[in-house]
């Protein structure tokens, strides 16, 4: 492999170039061969010719299997509840809807939007986590851990207290603002910390900001008597979601996921390190800005509809990288599908684990996510 680096320094620059080339070979290749690059006049032209070797067939299998599981989960989610409905009735209600039948009304007005919301929220949170982990090179990054979710819930609590008649779209906009506030606060604390931004330090900053926003939200809830409304957001769940909420999720998802696919290749390079990304001619600041905008859009929409559902954005990206490799052109769609599958089945379990009462779905995702977080934190203990 030949790279032409324009170096103004002699020994140090050459050593640094060798290290960067080794990182590129080891990480991008994912233990597969990287195709030979012909000689180029500059590094930017060379970077355009890099053939990203990825587990393409594995990614396609993951997508197909994930979509099949999602369809199965959707039918189960629609059929199971306070009153079980036969799968044939579910099929008829979806494809031959008759508004005069009570069972069809229950499916169309209650269970279908709930299932659609669960799938969309899971997908949005999973992609948010994948983007955050790629941008920060932090395996612990996730909307609920990095203060994004709590910032969004904090803004929602303000909206409930001071603007009780706010529309659904207005609530989403407040949620967006809170998500941006939470993310910028955590990043600001991390940047000024001693020793720089290590994964565990960033996670600790996110935890501190989360508790701060949660404390203020609780005080607002008590002072303005909106605790009952806010408790839904902190419990997390998709029960009672209407078609209007699904439409908002679809709009936010279309915008956020389109932007995510647009910067997927850049996030792949950025996940290998800022120095390498800059050496390949990438505008890292612009990529991070767009990436943070994506996280704010996706997380803000998810929290405004379903509340603070934690750890989906932590678990799913790690599973996806294990299955499909490091190419974010595959990580993003596979994370979306697997995130949707996880939350749909978690919502089913939330209805069954303590029937006839419902368990908050956020409690079930936390039950899975907390041990996984401790495992990752233990693995990253050297970053303290």
From Swiss-Prot:
Record-level Gene Ontology MF annotations: transmembrane transporter activity
Family stated for the protein in its record: Belongs to the binding-protein-dependent transport system permease family. FecCD subfamily.
Localisation: Cell membrane; Membrane raft
Membrane topology of the entry: Multi-pass membrane protein
UniProt entry keywords in alphabetical sequence: Cell membrane, Ion transport, Iron, Iron transport, Membrane, Transmembrane, Transmembrane helix, Transport
Subunit architecture: The complex is composed of an ATP-binding protein (FhuC), two transmembrane proteins (FhuB and FhuG) and a solute-binding protein (FhuD or YxeB).
PANTHER family hit by this protein: FERRIC ENTEROBACTIN TRANSPORT SYSTEM PERMEASE PROTEIN, IRON(3+)-HYDROXAMATE IMPORT SYSTEM PERMEASE PROTEIN FHUB
CDD domains per UniProt: TM_ABC_iron-siderophores_like
Function: Part of the ABC transporter complex FhuBGCD involved in iron(3+)-hydroxamate import. Responsible for the translocation of the substrate across the membrane.
Species assigned in the record: Bacillus subtilis (strain 168)
Keyword Iron in record: yes
Name of the molecule in the record: Iron(3+)-hydroxamate import system permease protein FhuB
GO biological process: siderophore-dependent iron import into cell
Gene3D superfamilies recorded: ABC transporter involved in vitamin B12 uptake, BtuC (1.10.3470.10)
Transmembrane parts of this sequence: 58-78, 115-135, 154-174, 176-196, 202-222, 243-263, 296-316, 330-350, 357-377
Signal sequence residues: none
Keyword Iron: yes
GO cellular component, one term: membrane raft
């Amino acid at each position: 492999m030949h790279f032409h680096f324009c170096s103004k320094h002699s020994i140090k620059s050459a050593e640094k170039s060798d290290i960067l080339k080794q990182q590129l070979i080891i990480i991008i290749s994912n233990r597969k061969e990287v195709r030979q690059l012909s000689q180029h006049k500059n590094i930017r032209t060379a970077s355009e010719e890099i053939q990203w070797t990825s587990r393409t067939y594995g990614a396609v299998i993951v997508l197909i299997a994930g979509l099949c599981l999602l369809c199965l989960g959707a039918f189960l989610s629609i059929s199971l509840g306070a009153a079980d409905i036969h799968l044939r009735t579910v099929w008829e209600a979806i494809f031959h809807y008759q508004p005069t039948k009570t069972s069809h009304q229950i499916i169309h007005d209650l269970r279908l939007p709930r299932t659609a919301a669960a799938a969309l929220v899971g997908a949005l949170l999973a992609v948010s986590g994948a983007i955050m982990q790629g941008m920060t090179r932090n395996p612990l990054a996730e909307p609920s851990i990095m203060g994004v979710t709590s910032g969004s819930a904090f803004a929602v609590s303000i909206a409930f207290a001071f603007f009780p008649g706010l529309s659904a779209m207005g609530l989403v906009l407040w949620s967006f603002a809170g998500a941006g506030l939470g993310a910028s606060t955590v990043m600001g604390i991390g940047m000024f910390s001693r020793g720089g931004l290590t994964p565990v330090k960033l996670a600790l900053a996110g935890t501190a900001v989360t508790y701060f926003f949660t404390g203020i939200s609780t005080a607002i809830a008590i002072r303005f008597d909106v605790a009952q409304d806010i408790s839904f957001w902190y419990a997390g769940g998709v029960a009672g979601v209407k078609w209007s909420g699904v439409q908002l999720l679809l709009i936010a998802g279309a915008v956020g996921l389109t932007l995510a696919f647009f910067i997927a290749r850049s996030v792949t390079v950025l996940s290998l390190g800022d120095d390498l990304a800059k050496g390949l001619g990438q505008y890292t600041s612009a990529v991070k800005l767009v990436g943070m905008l994506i996280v704010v859009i996706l997380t803000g929409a998810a929290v405004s509809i379903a509340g603070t559902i934690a750890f989906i954005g932590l678990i799913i990206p790690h599973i996806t990288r294990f299955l499909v490799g490091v190419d974010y052109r595959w990580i993003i769609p596979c994370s979306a599908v697997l995130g949707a599958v996880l939350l749909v089945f978690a919502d089913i379990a939330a209805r069954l684990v303590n029937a006839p009462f419902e368990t908050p779905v956020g409690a079930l995702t936390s039950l899975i996510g907390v041990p996984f977080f401790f495992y990752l934190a233990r693995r990253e203990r050297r970053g303290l």
